[in-house]
């Protein structure tokens, strides 16, 4: 915002230099003021002889100040006259240009000409020549005249302005729908509230331009450069922005729904509250971009780079982020329900309270991710890498985590009811107080895991590895520990093992095939072990043979 004092001084200065008489009056006034100051100093000096030298210096200073003031005002007046003359010359050039183009329109039927016609070539040459000698206001007048004369149509313009320099042009609030400004230099242009829908702006330079609230819907901006441009609340719905450059651009509240941003560079761009619903962002670069509260639902962000992105509360529901890079991204409170994140890299991402309900995270890399309080219910997470991740208090009920790497993961108080963890690697994982009721942990590795106070009621731990696991206070009611590797000492620390089913493994013809959790690829179908009914005897709940009962022989009856 301009300082009011500076504005008043500038207005006073322009008023003075606009007339020689005002300049002379100002000089006279300054002379009087300086003379009064000198007389005051002289009076003081006469009373004190030690100030006599100062008195003489003041007397010498008076003419020097007057000469300097006169030179400054004269030079200012001369510059003002030059500016006035330049504006007058510019006005004459613009009027001459209008007359020349009007003549071509009326006598040479310029509107019906093609870009190769002599009249069109003459109009283009005349236009490019005059644009070099005009100010931003004059250039704006030329563009408006060409558009209103139907010479800048988006399809095939009669006057082609490619490579024309329109830097700083003033076109705010101008109606120019369907204009062709392809490959034009519009750096620093003032285009606020401009109407340019369905326009051709391919490879146009718009760096640092002001496009606030501009309407560019359905426009073609492939390869356009908008570095540092202001597009707050701009309408870019359905626009083609492939390989466009938006580095450091301001897109707060912009409407980019259904826009094509494939390969675009949005590094460090501010997209707070922007609408990107259904947009195409394949291979786009969004490094360190700000996406807080933005709507990116149903967007295609396949293989895009979102490293370090800030997207608090952003709506990614139904979006395709397959193969995307989100290393170090901050997605706290983000909504990713039903999103596709297969093979995505979310290492070191922060996703507190994020909603990933029904999300597809198959094969994703999420090492060291922070997902405290997240919702991963019914999520598909086969072969996901969550080593060292913090999932405290997460809802993973019915999630598919088969062959997932959860080593050293923190899952304290997590809800994993009926979750599929077959073949999962949970070595040294923290599962204190976790809910694993009905969870499938067949072939899972739980060595050194902390399952203290965990609820494993009706969980399936067939062929699981529980060596050195901490089961202190764990509820193992109706748990299936068939062929599980667990010591009696470990089980003795559990809260309840009264109904643990652990048949004698000697009755299996062969050990079941269990895939090692670190093995890549899908989990093959394990061989179903064949269980032979023993000829005699039975086992108790903890697998200790009971006393054999002799078969009753009818002939032995008395």
Which residue ranges define each predicted feature?
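Cytosolic juxtamembrane N-terminal segments of multi-pass membrane proteins
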Residues: 1-16
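Membrane-embedded hydrophobic alpha-helical segments
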Residues: 19-85
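Compositionally biased, low-hydrophobicity segments enriched in charged and small polar residues
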Residues: 22-25, 33-45, 91-106, 471-484
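Charged/polar helix/coil "stalk" or linker segments at domain boundaries
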Residues: 49, 53, 68-205, 210, ...
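Residue-level detector of functional hotspots within protein domains
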Residues: 50, 57, 87, 477-480, ...
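Tandem repeat scaffolds
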Residues: 152-558
């Amino acid at each position: 915002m301009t300082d009011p004092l500076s504005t008043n001084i500038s207005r006073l200065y322009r008023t003075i230099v606009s007339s020689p008489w005002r300049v002379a009056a100002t000089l006279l006034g300054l002379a009087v003021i300086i003379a009064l100051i000198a007389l005051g100093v002289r009076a003081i000096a006469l009373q004190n002889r030690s100030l006599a030298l100062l008195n003489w210096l003041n007397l010498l200073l008076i003419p020097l100040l007057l000469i300097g003031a006169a030179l400054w005002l004269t030079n200012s007046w001369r510059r003002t006259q030059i500016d006035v003359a330049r504006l007058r010359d510019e006005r004459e050039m613009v009027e001459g240009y209008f007359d020349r183009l009007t003549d071509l329109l009326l006598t040479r039927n310029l509107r019906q000409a093609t870009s190769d016609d002599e009249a069109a070539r003459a109009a283009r040459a005349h236009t490019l020549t005059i644009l070099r000698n005009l100010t931003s206001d004059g250039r704006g007048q030329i563009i408006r005249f060409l558009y209103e004369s139907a010479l800048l149509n988006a399809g095939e313009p009669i006057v082609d302005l490619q490579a024309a320099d329109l830097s700083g042009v003033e076109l705010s609030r101008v109606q120019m729908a369907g204009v062709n400004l392809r490959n034009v230099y519009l750096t620093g242009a003032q285009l606020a509230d401009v109407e340019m829908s369905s326009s051709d702006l391919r490879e146009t330079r718009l760096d640092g331009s002001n496009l606030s609230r501009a309407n560019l819907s359905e426009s073609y901006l492939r390869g356009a450069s908008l570095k540092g441009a202001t597009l707050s609340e701009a309408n870019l719905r359905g626009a083609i922005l492939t390989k466009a450059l938006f580095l450091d651009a301001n897109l707060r509240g912009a409407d980019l729904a259904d826009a094509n941003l494939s390969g675009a560079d949005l590094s460090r761009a501010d997209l707070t509250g922007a609408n990107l619903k259904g947009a195409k962002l394949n291979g786009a670069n969004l490094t360190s971009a700000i996406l807080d509260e933005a709507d990116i639902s149903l967007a295609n962000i396949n293989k895009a780079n979102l490293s370090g992105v800030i997207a608090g509360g952003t709506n990614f529901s139904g979006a395709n982020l397959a193969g995307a890079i989100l290393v170090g991204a901050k997605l706290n409170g983000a909504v990713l329900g039903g999103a596709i994140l297969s093979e995505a890299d979310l290492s070191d991402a922060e996703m507190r309270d994020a909603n990933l309900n029904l999300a597809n995270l198959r094969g994703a890399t999420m090492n060291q991710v922070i997902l405290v309080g997240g919702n991963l219910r019914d999520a598909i997470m086969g072969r996901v890498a969550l080593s060292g991740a913090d999932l405290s208090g997460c809802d993973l009920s019915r999630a598919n985590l088969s062959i997932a790497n959860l080593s050293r993961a923190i899952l304290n108080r997590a809800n994993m009811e009926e979750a599929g963890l077959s073949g999962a690697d949970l070595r040294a994982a923290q599962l204190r107080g976790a809910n694993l009721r009905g969870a499938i942990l067949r072939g899972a590795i739980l060595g050194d895991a902390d399952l203290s106070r965990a609820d494993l009621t009706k969980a399936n731990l067939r062929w699981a590895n529980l060596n050195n696991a901490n089961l202190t206070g764990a509820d193992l009611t109706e748990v299936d520990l068939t062929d599980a590797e667990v010591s009696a000492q470990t089980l003795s620390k559990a809260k309840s093992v009264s109904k643990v089913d652990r048949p004698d493994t000697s009755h299996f013809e062969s050990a079941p095939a269990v895939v090692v959790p670190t093995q890549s690829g899908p989990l093959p179908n394990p061989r179903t072990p064949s269980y032979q009914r023993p000829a005699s005897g039975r086992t108790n709940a903890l697998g200790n043979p009971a006393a054999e009962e002799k078969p009753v022989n009818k002939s032995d009856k008395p």
